[in-house]
Amino acid sequence: FKIVKFMNMKGDSVRTLNFQQKGFDDETLNIADGLDANVTHYMQVSPTRDYVYISYSGRTPYAVGSDNDKGILYMYVEQYEWNGNPVRKYKLDTFSISMMVDGRLNRLMLITYYNDDPYFIYQLKD
């Protein structure tokens, strides 16, 4: 996702998160797998009762693959309250395209395919 919008149930209050990165390279549309040359925007959104968690790599898919081949695994997760105001940013020491948040136990759970043990659990800050 390039843009995530937070709004109330009436739709009269909206806050927009716009992934601020370098411009999109239109020439990549003419190349096989060319989109992978552009920085990945927000990847996953996981809501809880109190917060919304959004993940992203901050890199191009090519860079992610190259880093992962070298054993350099990381990604970012941003935590927002329901009005769209930032609370916290985490840099995780693994990379995943599957993220779940347990709001009751305050844990972030990831499933990866880069590790022999694919399950990662992070205790989030209160």
Put a short name on every predicted segment.
Residues 1-126:
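Eukaryotic scaffold repeat domains enriched in small/polar residues
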